[in-house]
Amino acid sequence: MTLPGHPTGMARPRGAGPCSPGLERAPRRSVGELRLLFEARCAAVAAAAAAGEPRARGAKRRGGQVPNGLPRAAPAPVIPQLTVTSEEDVAPASPGPPDREGNWLPAAGSHLQQPRRLSTSSLSSTGSSSLLEDSEDDLLSDSESRSRGNVQLETSEDVGQKSHWQKIRTMVNLPVMSPFKKRYSWVQLAGHTGSFKAAGTSGLILKRSSEPEHYCLVRLMADVLRGCVPAFHGVVERDGESYLQLQDLLDGFDGPCVLDCKMGVRTYLEEELTKARERPKLRKDMYKKMLAVDPEAPTEEEHAQRAVTKPRYMQWREGISSSTTLGFRIEGIKKADGSCSTDFKTTRSREQVTRVFEEFMQGDAEVLKRYLNRLQQIRDTLEISDFFRRHEVIGSSLLFVHDHCHRAGVWLIDFGKTTPLPDGQILDHRRPWEEGNREDGYLLGLDNLIGILANLAER
């Protein structure tokens, strides 16, 4: 992403760029062109059969011979069914990660890439146990599904015709499939299962719409923070539900490593705290989550009830992590090999957080430099953002993404709990939170995060 006013662009196609010099894409053909090729081939085969031309190979003879060398008429060919699975439209341009030199790439939407496929499993806070299902929805991606726009041919069962149709299948399919050998599948970190769907368009994903997040994204697209958040492309309907069309932040990375960092000193709204006090609701599921981390954490009364309230659980959750001490906490990490690390619930001290980032970046000094520069750009932009000063930002994350080609990016994500302040009120985002002042500690956390990475860079 760039500072405000700098055009954002789409990531370079996978297989291009510094990681694979000299590689070129296979020729691109639209579905319409492929259909014409297919129909022309079928017509040629049918015409040859109707004219009684001999087969070039494998012509059978009675008893192994054709009398007098005369050709035997070939059976009428069975034309395979052509199935076009999707549109041939080119994906719209959307912002992407920087190139090897750290420059944000210009818009380029001339190539249709494989859409990613969402996993139906949820790793809460990148965890394998759903300990933090109340946290906001974040996504990672690691493998792609079959491209929309593929052309599939159902081959004839006639052995004699099989080779003809196999040639056509190859002719039609290879231009579409060959540029995209490496595929990834979605992994959802934190949040509720089923929040995301594949968009079916390169560079985009769908997230289940909520009124608060829709409100925020519309306003963010007109704010200086536009280049620091996923590009928003409107709302679409899928299976009777509304979804937000968002930029796929992993598009253009090769085997991305991803870290989700939840920002702020709290992940609950003040109004949630008030409502919980007025109408307390005991949660057995949260009691079990608390017990799984620390059997001594519940009080005697909570042990007797075998339940806790949500505010009690969330305040405890933030107290055992770095949220209250540093203004952020690490939710989870997905490595390039697809493995997820989620054991950060008690990662609290600056030293512990530093070790986690060292492990995440694996000593890549170039990635560290780019992360640090990007965080400083984001902080500068937040400090002049009218949207930021007039909103309480709760449950939002910074998403860190890098790959082995030293591409790296950081974005603000998740605005489902971001709420506007009463007219005339603004936040400092660094002042300590006291109930009633609505301070979230976002910039406090970002200052500490930048300090930790700056210390790493000096080593």
From Swiss-Prot:
Keyword terms: ATP-binding, Calmodulin-binding, Cytoplasm, Cytoskeleton, Kinase, Methylation, Nucleotide-binding, Phosphoprotein, Transferase
Gene Ontology biological process: actin cytoskeleton organization; cellular response to calcium ion; dendritic spine maintenance; inositol metabolic process; inositol phosphate biosynthetic process; modification of postsynaptic actin cytoskeleton; phosphatidylinositol phosphate biosynthetic process; positive regulation of dendritic spine morphogenesis
Record protein name field: Inositol-trisphosphate 3-kinase A
Keyword Acyltransferase: no
Stretches with biased composition (Low complexity): 116-132
Reaction catalyzed: 1D-myo-inositol 1,4,5-trisphosphate + ATP = 1D-myo-inositol 1,3,4,5-tetrakisphosphate + ADP + H(+)
Family: Belongs to the inositol phosphokinase (IPK) family.
Main EC class the enzyme belongs to: transferase
InterPro entries: IPK, IPK_sf
Gene behind the chain: Itpka
Pfam families: IPK
Modified sites of kind Phosphoserine: S135, S195
Residue positions binding substrate: K262, R283, K310, P311, R312, Y313, M314, Q315, W316, R317, K417
Protein activity control: Activated by calcium/calmodulin.
Localisation per UniProt entry: Cytoplasm, Cytoskeleton
Top-rank lineage group of the source organism: Eukaryota
Species: Rattus norvegicus (Rat)
